[in-house]
Amino acid sequence: MTGFTIEGSSLKLLKPQEQGVVSRIDSSRGDFVAQKLRSMNITLGTRVTVEQRSPRFLLRVGADQVALSDPLQDAIYVRLSR
C-alpha cells in the first residue's frame, strides 16, 4: 500500500468523514476491479467520503453509500479535499 504523496493518498488511509476526489484507479488490479468501480459510479474525479472503516469499509458516493472490499479499496487513490 502506498502512503501519502504530493498527488494524494491511498483511499485506505482516509479516516471516517474525510473526503477525497478520485485521482487514480490502479489498473494493474485488472478489468474486473475497474468495471466494478464504474458500476458503483466511482471514476476519476468522483468526490467520495469515508463513512466507516470497520466492520465494513463504507464510502459515500453522491447520495449512495457503497461497501468496498479490500481489492476495491486498494485500487483507489484520492486527492484530499475539505
UniProtKB/Swiss-Prot annotation:
InterPro entries recorded for this chain? Fe-transptr_FeoA-like, FeoA_core_dom, Transcriptional_repressor_C
GO BP term, example: iron ion transport
Q: Which domain of life is it from?
A: Bacteria
Query: Any idea which UniProt keywords this protein has?
Result: Ion transport, Iron, Iron transport, Transport
Record-linked SMART domains: FeoA
* Pfam families to which the protein is assigned, alphabetical: FeoA
Q: From the UniProt record, which GO molecular function terms apply?
A: transition metal ion binding
Record's family? Belongs to the FeoA family.
What is this protein's function per UniProt?
Answer: Might be involved in Fe(2+) ion uptake.
Q: What's the protein here called? A: Putative Fe(2+) transport protein A
- Which species does this protein come from? Leptolyngbya boryana
